[in-house]
């Protein structure tokens, strides 16, 4: 892996690190007595997100490298969509952890799910491994969407319900 590889792996981690530094009092809705029994513990959630962000960063590096690197036109769609989904992923963290807005977080997740699924199809002809590395991300988004939906539906956080 060239010097750019660690940069591609590290950039996705910057958003959550900054968000955690800026959020002084994260939401405690998943820690009270009404917590979903099938919701993973916070440490597991944190570990999964860190792993997912690192793996998707490596996958984006594979696509970038396969298309010749640099900032050329063939990279615009595959890495442009990747950048947009990364921003949506960071937005979800803000909506879910800081804004106590499960309705908006759910809408964000649905858009994010569609973007990641699109990335799998767009990246597959470029680099099959990169596309396959996004599949655990889709699986985790499914779990996260189910948790967020239940929190919204069961009115654990009644504010901002659509």
From Swiss-Prot:
GO terms, molecular function: 5-aminolevulinic acid transmembrane transporter activity; cholesterol binding
Annotated Gene Ontology cellular component terms: endoplasmic reticulum; endoplasmic reticulum membrane; plasma membrane
Pfam family name, one: TspO_MBR
Inactivation phenotype: Decreases erythrocyte count and increases reticulocyte count. Abnormal erythroblast cytokinesis and differentiation. Decreases hemoglobin levels in maturing erythroid cells.
Subcellular location field: Endoplasmic reticulum membrane; Cell membrane
Designated name of the protein: Translocator protein 2
Regions crossing the membrane: 3-23, 44-64, 79-99, 103-123, 129-149
Main location per the UniProt record: endoplasmic reticulum
Name of encoding gene: Tspo2
UniProt note: domains: The C-terminal region mediates cholesterol-binding.
